[in-house]
């Protein structure tokens, strides 16, 4: 009788085929929380060389996946269990959607035979993700897996980047297929992948844009995280240097050109946007962050040249001139057009001089405030010390993750970015809770860089348990917590607000004063510091930065420093 192993070809299940498909299509990292029915999928992915970073919560894992997509230009992969795991993962998927970052969420789901019967964690997950997914696929048979994986990966990076979703039922994950057939399916998918078609000629739009910039008396270049995602830093540098036009980065555009660049208008923002007559806006949306491009913040007659990869965005904003295209490509074409007939404002140009003068004045005023050693700490004193410590780091610039109200607002003005994609913050939605996930994504995507998170205590609390994840993977991340005892700080209520049967309860904005956040990481073997003076903070930063090990620096802040809602109190 023949040995059965000699006659039966080797087989694999759906878990292995998902892992194989991801690996063959270039995926190197995954983030997620395992459980029924996807634990084996994570293990199989690791066995094939994919690094799986296991989190405590799908929200943080999803935020990590979205940021990884931005930092690398490749879709970040989130793996979740079914039902509530998928729902928790929506935080990351929606974050990718609103920030236009490539990401794919893969969730297990209940057995197809049990749909509608109240199965374990049953949910119509395709319907649940619809609002935040560019493309949602469900593999109904094991043989569909490679094609489904390929489609969601490709769609995530096509056109305007964003999140996609792949649903894999439990029975499909368990379904068997011969290894030879599986390999054939994966190979066929690899061969059939097509690059996104390049849009037709932009010659007329490029000529019009250059003409507008050439004739402008007070031109301004504005760029955002879309330009950073596009890797447009070299093209932007060339454009600014050949034209002498001042530039203004949005918060996550900082670093594409150094904040210290002579043509930076960051410290003269109000003057720059209020007086410019032509604004070239690249990879940045005219949303609330840029005051919708409307007066009184902007001149009512300003002419916008809007460069965006999304035609829908241009149709929404109705600029004077819209150019649909990738930021790197379009800026390169502008440079080529200008080269044929160069123009440069020059440092002595009145517009350039006025921007430079105002930036210098505002910078000097800020430095006077920063130079003061205020104890108990306000926000400025520790932020200056952190800035100086980050600038002193040798080698590649650290990635700065910023989250909070006052903490993020002050950090945006004080911390200096010199290299592209070295600042991650709450983004388009102003999302709190992204901090630790972003830190982990940055540490994984750029292992040669130190990651420094500057967090408010409220923002830190959303994902604080992920400090264990930092320690478990020994990531070079230092978390600096601005501990002012609550959301915005201490109890700021007026007498008329303190009444009723629960008036003795803490204010809705209050936390336990002087909480020992540094002890949380110590519970897992990381290093914790508590600091209340400039010398203590300098010492903690010097030691933790040099060690490049997981650490939490707990900075005690005056609970009444800062403002409620930071710079957005008018919206509260």
UniProtKB/Swiss-Prot annotation:
Cofactor details (free text): Binds 1 Mg(2+) ion per subunit. Binds 1 thiamine pyrophosphate per subunit.
InterPro entries according to UniProt: DHS-like_NAD/FAD-binding_dom, HACL1-like, THDP-binding, Thiamin_PyroP_enz_cen_dom, Thiamin_PyroP_enz_TPP-bd_dom, TPP-bd_CS, TPP_enzyme_TPP-bd
Region (Thiamine pyrophosphate binding): 407-488
A GO term, aspect molecular function: thiamine pyrophosphate binding
Ligand binding (Mg(2+)): 457, 484
Cofactor: Mg(2+); thiamine diphosphate
Enzyme Commission designation: 4.1.2.63
N-acetylalanine sites (modified residues): 2
Highest taxon in the source lineage: Eukaryota
Metal-binding is among the record's keywords: yes
Reaction(s) the record says it catalyses: an (R)-2-hydroxy-long-chain-fatty acyl-CoA = a long-chain fatty aldehyde + formyl-CoA; a 2-hydroxy-3-methyl fatty acyl-CoA = a 2-methyl-branched fatty aldehyde + formyl-CoA
PROSITE patterns the UniProt entry points to: TPP_ENZYMES
Key word Metal-binding present: yes
GO cellular component, as recorded: cytosol; plastid
Positions that bind thiamine diphosphate: 58
Subunit structure: Homotetramer.
Family: Belongs to the TPP enzyme family.
Protein name: 2-hydroxyacyl-CoA lyase
Lineage: Eukaryota, Viridiplantae, Streptophyta, Embryophyta, Tracheophyta
Gene: HACL
């Amino acid at each position: 009788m023949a040995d059965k192993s000699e006659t039966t070809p080797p087989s694999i299940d759906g878990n292995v085929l998902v892992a194989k498909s991801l690996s063959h299509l270039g995926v190197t990292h995954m983030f997620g929380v395992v459980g029924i029915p996807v634990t084996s999928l994570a293990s199989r992915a690791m066995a094939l060389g994919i690094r799986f970073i296991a989190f405590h919560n799908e929200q943080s894992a999803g935020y990590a996946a979205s940021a990884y997509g931005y930092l690398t230009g490749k879709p970040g992969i989130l793996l979740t269990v079914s039902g509530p795991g998928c729902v928790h993962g929506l935080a990351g998927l929606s974050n990718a959607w609103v920030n236009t970052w490539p990401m794919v969420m893969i969730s297990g789901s209940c057995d197809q035979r049990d749909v509608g019967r109240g199965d374990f964690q049953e949910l119509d997950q395709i319907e649940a993700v619809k609002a935040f997914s560019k493309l949602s696929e469900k593999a109904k048979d094991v043989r569909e897996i490679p094609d489904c994986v390929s489609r969601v990966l490709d769609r995530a990076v096509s056109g305007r980047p964003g999140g996609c979703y792949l649903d894999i039922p439990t029975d499909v994950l368990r379904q068997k297929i011969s290894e030879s057939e599986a390999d054939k399916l994966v190979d066929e998918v690899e061969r059939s992948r097509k690059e996104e078609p390049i849009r037709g000629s932009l010659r007329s739009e490029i000529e019009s844009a250059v003409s507008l910039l050439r004739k402008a008396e007070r031109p301004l270049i504005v760029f955002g995280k879309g330009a950073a995602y596009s890797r447009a830093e070299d093209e932007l540098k060339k454009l600014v240097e050949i034209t002498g036009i001042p530039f203004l980065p949005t918060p996550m555009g900082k670093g594409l050109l150094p904040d210290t660049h002579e043509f930076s208008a960051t410290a003269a923002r109000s003057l720059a946007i209020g007086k410019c007559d032509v604004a070239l806006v690249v990879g940045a949306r005219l949303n609330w962050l840029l005051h919708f491009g409307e007066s009184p913040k902007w001149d009512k007659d300003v002419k916008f040249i809007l460069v965006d990869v999304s035609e829908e965005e241009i149709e929404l904003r109705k600029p004077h001139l819209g150019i649909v295209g990738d930021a790197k490509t379009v800026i390169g074409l502008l440079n080529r057009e200008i080269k044929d007939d160069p123009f440069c404002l020059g440092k002595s140009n009145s517009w350039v001089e006025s921007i430079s003068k105002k930036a210098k004045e505002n910078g000097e005023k800020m430095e006077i405030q920063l130079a003061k050693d205020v104890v108990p700490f306000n926000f400025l004193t520790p932020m200056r010390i952190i800035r100086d410590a980050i600038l002193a780091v040798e080698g590649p610039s650290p990635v700065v993750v910023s989250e909070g109200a006052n903490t993020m607002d002050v950090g945006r003005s004080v911390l200096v970015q010199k290299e592209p994609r070295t600042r991650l913050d709450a983004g388009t939605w102003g999302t709190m809770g992204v901090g630790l996930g972003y830190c982990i994504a940055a540490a994984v995507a750029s292992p040669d860089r130190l990651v420094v998170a500057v967090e408010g205590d409220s923002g830190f609390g959303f994902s604080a348990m992920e400090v264990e994840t930092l320690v478990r993977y020994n990531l070079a991340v230092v978390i600096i917590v601005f501990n002012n005892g609550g959301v915005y700080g201490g109890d700021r209520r007026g007498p008329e607000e303190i009444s009723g049967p629960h008036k003795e309860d803490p204010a809705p904005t209050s936390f336990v004063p002087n909480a020992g956040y540094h002890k949380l990481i110590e519970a897992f073997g990381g290093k914790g510091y508590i600091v209340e003076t400039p010398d203590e903070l300098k010492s903690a930063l010097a030691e933790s930065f040099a060690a490049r090990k997981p650490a939490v620096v707990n900075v005690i802040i005056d609970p009444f420093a800062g403002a409620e809602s930071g710079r957005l109190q008018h919206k509260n």
